[in-house]
UniProtKB/Swiss-Prot annotation:
Cofactor(s) of this protein: Mg(2+)
Regulation of protein activity: Phosphorylated and activated by pdk-1.
Annotated phenotype, changing K222M: Probable loss of kinase activity. Increased apoptosis during embryonic development in an akt-2 tm1075 mutant background
Organism domain of life: Eukaryota
Residue sites binding ATP per the record: L199, G200, K201, G202, T203, F204, G205, K206, V207, K222
Name this protein carries in UniProt: Serine/threonine-protein kinase akt-1
Disruption phenotype: Increased resistance to pathogens. Simultaneous knockdown of akt-1 and akt-2 result in dauer formation and a weak extension to life span.
Amino acid sequence: MSMTSLSTKSRRQEDVVIEGWLHKKGEHIRNWRPRYFMIFNDGALLGFRAKPKEGQPFPEPLNDFMIKDAATMLFEKPRPNMFMVRCLQWTTVIERTFYAESAEVRQRWIHAIESISKKYKGTNANPQEELMETNQQPKIDEDSEFAGAAHAIMGQPSSGHGDNCSIDFRASMISIADTSEAAKRDKITMEDFDFLKVLGKGTFGKVILCKEKRTQKLYAIKILKKDVIIAREEVAHTLTENRVLQRCKHPFLTELKYSFQEQHYLCFVMQFANGGELFTHVRKCGTFSEPRARFYGAEIVLALGYLHRCDIVYRDMKLENLLLDKDGHIKIADFGLCKEEISFGDKTSTFCGTPEYLAPEVLDDHDYGRCVDWWGVGVVMYEMMCGRLPFYSKDHNKLFELIMAGDLRFPSKLSQEARTLLTGLLVKDPTQRLGGGPEDALEICRADFFRTVDWEATYRKEIEPPYKPNVQSETDTSYFDNEFTSQPVQLTPPSRSGALATVDEQEEMQSNFTQFSFHNVMGSINRIHEASEDNEDYDMG
């Protein structure tokens, strides 16, 4: 499905504003590719491999942009008649570079883009609103052998006690209403926590093990610098992570307790999974047994299936983002690259992710859908069972060629069921990939490799993990890099180089993060009626 409409097949030739051949620069393998582009009067800029045939429905585009509120810039080097368009890809601002056959052709395209952009600039109108339809939840065949898997994927186990993830959503709404007065009294700041150890450090900030003073509970707090987020144009990714964490409650997703902001920082207070990254454990063991890989794979499939049911594509599957909790269960972390509002058939084309884990359709400059996550699952499960990446080269161009055209190789010890699963997940064509159909995760649940899995028991954490991290206490950080845990716990003040920011500049920076704060009500439902926890219910800020 096109980003800008329910279906390109519903478009009409008479709605085309301008069309013709342009060369577009690839985003990964950065060569120039001829594409037949069309601008429609609703602001859609669609690119096709070949000119659409007259009198026939438009095919699905390779490129799909929205030029409402677009900006353009002209260049003459390294090629003449170049131009750059800064526009929207879903909710993300992106830049794409083109060149035309002549200055006159380029000017016609610039004029069309600017005319459309001016038409919609500053409006909240959705030119495709009349084409939108409700995304219906599928009905489950209760007599099916895989009914339990379907319930687990949807986060609706058909029986059993479950945990907070299975609590009726209406109960959470009641708890919000009942505790609104308490919420008004409860504003979370850094002063509410004791900082204990640094768990990780990156460009945008730090992750620190902390203890909430009021409850004495341990959390991992991710503290990000606002100025760096803005300078690196990561505002959209940061806000997406916040929204996804707020929306999604699942046993195998890291749970957000609070998000709040200080003058210079954004803070995510999250569950602390002290079993460390799966990457650490694979590196230590070399390979996992197939039963161990099956256990982790089943939990990952359920979590991603749940995200997909919420119309969210994860897009950053890698061993470093798969944590183990103290009992040995999976916790998927880091939701900054998620893309929202992507259901079956929907596409996006933003380049993101770790090079070794990128799916072929991403590298080939195609729009892609939720099936990229199943490619990522194929890569991490290959690493677990084979001890190496399926495709690897230090040279990124060579790496990308291997991902797009290389053959899979398996160690002789691998079972036929494991080979079939990995081969299905690592199919180059996303439409033929295991999980690529409308049933999504359920296709993978049916694989012979997962034949012995009780999916509902897996969801309820009733299956004993094959490995339990050897942690001595709640504050044990032995599975985290000593390079970080040995560092002093302190925050680096924002850079003061150059002139101090004006009041207007400060207000502009803060305006990027309005409505950021969140206090987790869902996680407190089971404690609503405990007198000692009367103040444990929080507001939505």
